[in-house]
Amino acid sequence: MTTIRGGSRRASLPALALLGVLLGACHSDDNAQVNTLPGFVSGNVRKTAYDGASDDLLTAGLGKTGLGSDTRPGFANPAQPTAAELRRLAIYSNYRALVDITPNGGYGRFWGPNVDLAGNDTLGEGKIAGTEYLAYSDDGSGRKNVTLLVQVPASFDPANPCIVTATSSGSRGVYGAIAAAGEWGLKRGCAVAYNDKGGGNGAHEIGTGVVTLIDGTLASASSAGSASLFTASESSSALAAFNSAFPNRYAYKHAHSQQNPEQDWGRVTLQAVEFAYWALNEQFGPAIDGARHGVRYRPGDITTIAASVSNGGAAALAAAEQDTRGWITAVVVGEPQINVRMTPGVTVEQGGVPAPSFGRPLADYATLANLLQPCAAAAVAAVGAPYLSALPVGLTQSIRVQRCATLAAAGLVSGADTASQANDALAQLHAAGYLADSDLLQAPMWDSQAIPAIAVTYANAYTRSRVTDNLCNFSFATTNSVTGAVAPPATSPMTSLFGAGNGVPPTNGINLVFNGASGGVDHRLATPDASFAGAFCLRQLWTANQLGIGANVDAVRVAANLQRKPAIIVQGRSDALVPVNHASRAYVAQNSATEGRASQLSFYEVTNGQHFDAFLSVPGFDTRFVPVHYYDEQALNLMWNHLKSGAPLPPSQVIRTVPRGGVPGAAPALSTANLPPIVQSPGSNAITVNAGVIDVPL
C-alpha cells in the first residue's frame, strides 16, 4: 500500500518531502496543469494494488466459488483482524446482501464473477486485478468523513475512459454496492467510484469508547480523533452518564451523527466522481518533473454512468440533478429510495385510475408501515406469506394479535376481532399507496425487522437526535439471545463490524431494543404488542411534525430534474420496503412535469419483483418473486449501447415476468422463461408518461 499525503488536517509539507511522495500536497482547481487532489479530500489517500490472484477488486481473492460459499472468510486473530481481512469480509458480506447467491436462483448463470457482460459463463473465478484509492471526504470539521473509494481495473483503457458510480445502498459501508453496480463497471473496464454517503456502517461502542477507522480497524475515540469514521458528538461525561444508565449501547453514524446525511447524498456522489477523475489523472496523466502528474481528463471527458440501487440509486439521481460541471453522462438506478418534491397536478395512475396516494416521503410511509404491518400480517390477503423471522411462529402470531388489539383500543384500526382488524390495517396500507401486489410481503418486511430498523434509524436522522436521546425509547444494544434483554456481549461486535455489519441495527449482534420500565429488551419482545408505544411515538413525529422532522425531510427532497441526461429507473412492482407509488412512479411523473419532452428517462417496472434479491432463496420468495438485479444489469447494458453506439433506449414499460413456482424452498431453477427481455416495442405493456401524469398498465 502506498500512502499519498493529502489534506492539511493531517499532513505537513516537511513530512511530504521526507517521504518523497509529493503527489497531492496542495489543493487547487482541477483545470490547473498539475493534477491536484480535490479540496474536499481529507488526510491521506491510500493506494493499494491487487494482483487479481491472491487478492482482487471484485472478490477480495475469494473468486466466484468463495463468494458463493456459505462459509464466510475468517480472521487469523479473531480479536484483532487486519484491514485486509476486514476488507475481504466486507466484500463477501456486501456482495451476498444484494443478490441471490444460490445457483438455482441465478448465481453463476445469470450473474456472478464468472458471468461476462453478454451473460455467458466465460470468466472463471472472475477475479479482477487493479488498484484502489481510499480516502475521506470532509468539510474540515472531521465529523463528515465520507468514505470515498475508487477501483481502477487493470483492463481500464485510458483512450476510452469510463466511470461507474457505486454509491452504497442502505447505510452500508463503502463496498455496499459492489454487486449492484461495481461488478458491472469493473467487467466493463471502467473505474468504479464508491462512497458510503456519510452514513455508512460507522459505530461507537459507548461503554468502551471504541470506534472504527476508515479501514474497519478499531481505535479509542480519543486516540482516533478526526480519523474516526464516526464518534458520537456528546461529551465524555455525558456518554459516561448515559452508559451508566443504559449500558451496552451503541451509537450509529446514520442514526446519530446529527447531520441528516441524506441531504448530502448527491453531493458526495459527485465528489466520488471527482475523486475518480483525480485518481485516473494520477495513474494515466502525463508525468511532470518526475514526481507529479498532469491533467489528462477534465470534467465531461469521461463517460460516466451514475448507478446503484435503493439509497444508492437515490444518491445517483440526486447527483445527476445537482451536476453543474458535466461529471455525469447518464443514470441507471434500481429501486431508488427517493423523496420527491411533488408539484400540483402531478399524478400517478395505474390502469387509468389515480393511485390513492403517491409521492410520500420515507418518513411518512415507513413509520406508518412500522405501526400497521404487524397487524396487517394477519390479514386474509397475507395468508401464506413467507416466514422471515428467527422467532417461533407461535410468538410471531401472538405479536400480530396483540398489535391488532392495541391498535383497535387506540382507535387506529376498526373491527371486533383480529381478522377484521388485520384486514382494516392492510386496507389502510393500500390507501396509503401500497399495492396489493405486495400484500404477501407486509409480514416479512416487519418480521425481518427491515421496516422497524428503517423507521428508527431514519427518525433519528431526520430529527438530528443524539444517541443519548433514546428517541421514542429505542436504542441499539447487545442482547441476551434467549430473553432479548440487554446484556454484555461475549465478544464485542465492533471487531467484525466493518466486515459484517450493514449500518442499520439489528446487525452483527447489535439489536434494536425498547427501553421500558424493566429495562431495554428486543423491541419485538419488550411488550406483548411489540413495543407499540415506541412505534406510535415514531409515527407521531411525522404526523405532528415534531423535533424538526418536516424541515429535515424537506432538505432531502429532489426536484426530479435530470437536466436532459439519459436515464433508466428499474423497480419491482411488489416492492413493500420502498413502495413504487412513492418512489419510481412518483419520480417519473414529476420528471415529466419538470423536463417535459426534453426528458430522456425510461422506467421499467418488473412484475413479481421486490426489494431484496438476497431473500429470493427463502421459501416462498423463491416460488413467487424474480430477481430485479437481472434487469438492473440489462439496463446498464442498454445504457452503454445507447451512449457508445447510439442505440435507442427502450421506452418505459412493464416487464411481465413469470415466477418460478414449484414448492416453497425448492423452486425450479431460474431460466430465461422467467425473465422476458426489455423490448423496443412494448405494445400494451407501455407505460405512458406525459405532462406530469404517469399511467402504468394493470
From Swiss-Prot:
One biological process term from GO is: butyrate metabolic process
Q: Which Pfam families match?
A: 3HBOH
What GO CC terms are in its UniProt record? extracellular space
One Gene Ontology term of the molecular function aspect: hydroxybutyrate-dimer hydrolase activity
Q: Which UniProt keywords apply?
A: Hydrolase, Secreted, Signal
In which pathway does this enzyme or protein participate? Lipid metabolism; butanoate metabolism
Into which family does the record put it? Belongs to the D-(-)-3-hydroxybutyrate oligomer hydrolase family.
The answer to keyword Hydrolase applying to this record is yes
What's this chain's function? Participates in the degradation of poly-3-hydroxybutyrate (PHB). It works downstream of poly(3-hydroxybutyrate) depolymerase, hydrolyzing D(-)-3-hydroxybutyrate oligomers of various length (3HB-oligomers) into 3HB-monomers.
Question: Where does this polypeptide localize?
Answer: Secreted
Keyword Signal set for record: yes
The name this protein goes by in its record: D-(-)-3-hydroxybutyrate oligomer hydrolase
- Which residues does UniProt assign to the signal peptide? 1-32
Origin species: Burkholderia thailandensis (strain ATCC 700388 / DSM 13276 / CCUG 48851 / CIP 106301 / E264)
Catalytic activity of the protein: (3R)-hydroxybutanoate dimer + H2O = 2 (R)-3-hydroxybutanoate + H(+)
Supply the EC number(s): 3.1.1.22
Looking up InterPro entries in the UniProt record yields: AB_hydrolase_fold, OHBut_olig_hydro_put
Active site residues of this protein: 310 (charge relay system)
